[in-house]
Design a protein with these regions (language model features):
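Extended hydrophobic secondary-structure segments
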Residues: 73-81
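Short secondary-structure boundary segments
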Residues: 78, 107, 129-130
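Low-complexity, compositionally biased segments
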Residues: 80-84, 95
């Protein structure tokens, strides 16, 4: 929780504060459900219309399925910059209403690549690096006798 607070204090936006904020469908869920369409359908039935359903994809073919299935948010995982650019374009043009699918780049994005990823047209960038790679401050207390 402290890492999430630090991100907000630094001007960032947290993806989710808890597991109940939104549904995030990942590869294990897809393996269980059998297809992207089935996973999205089951998630929407389980949580109702007010909870956002997001799905993680790592190919353009999966992206097309996720858009067709009606996912509101798509996490573009471990894609190179050119693929991200194409994916963002599809998210913004292959839907019934432009920009109804929020696309977020994720996976392997550090500060050295951040600007290039931002220029691909994605709506957001997930930087797990901010929270899972931060070093703790070494604080000690010495008593003098």
């Amino acid at each position: 929780v402290l890492q999430k607070y630090a991100v907000r204090a630094g001007g960032g936006v947290n993806h989710r504060m808890g597991l109940d904020d939104a549904v995030l469908i990942k590869d294990n869920h897809l393996a269980y459900c059998g297809s992207i369409a089935q996973a999205v359908r089951q998630a929407k039935q389980a949580v109702g219309p007010l909870t956002c359903v997001e799905i993680e994809v790592d190919t353009l073919a999966q992206l097309n399925e996720a858009i067709a299935a009606g996912a509101e948010r798509i996490l573009l995982d471990n894609m190179d910059d050119e693929t991200l650019k194409e994916a963002a374009n599809r998210c913004h043009t292959q839907t019934a209403h432009p920009h109804t699918v929020y696309c977020e780049a994720s996976g392997g994005i550090g500060f050295n690549r951040l600007k290039r990823v931002a220029q691909t047209g994605v709506d957001g960038i997930a930087l797990g690096y901010l929270t899972h790679s931060s070093r703790s401050l070494d604080i000690g207390l010495d008593f003098v006798a």
